[in-house]
A protein has these predicted regions:
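Positively charged, low-complexity terminal tracts
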Residues: 1-80
Length: 80
C-alpha cells in the first residue's frame, strides 16, 4: 500500500469524484465481460485498452476497493 493522504473536499465535489470512479469501474467491468463473452454490455460501450479479461476484472475490482474506501470514510464522518 502506498502513502495515505487526508484530503478536504466539498461534498458536491466528492460526489463528482465518486461518479467518475464508478464510471471507470463500470467501464472496466464491461471490458471484462466483452473480452470473456464477446458481448457488448450496452449501446455506449467502449472497450478499454486491454486484451485479458482477468486483468480487466482486477482493474475493476481495484476501482471498487477505492470507492468502498471513500464511502467508508464518508460514513465515518457522519455521512452526506
Amino acid at each position: 500500500m502506498g502513502k495515505e493522504f487526508q484530503i478536504k473536499i466539498d461534498s458536491l465535489d466528492l460526489g463528482q469524484v465518486l461518479d467518475g470512479l464508478r464510471a471507470r469501474q463500470q467501464s472496466w467491468k464491461n471490458t471484462a465481460i466483452f473480452l470473456r463473452d464477446d458481448y457488448f454490455p450496452d449501446d455506449s460501450f467502449v472497450c478499454e485498452q486491454c486484451s485479458d479479461p482477468d486483468e480487466a476484472e482486477k482493474i475493476a475490482s481495484h476501482y471498487e476497493r477505492i470507492i468502498r474506501s471513500v464511502e467508508q470514510q464518508i460514513d465515518q464522518q457522519g455521512g452526506w
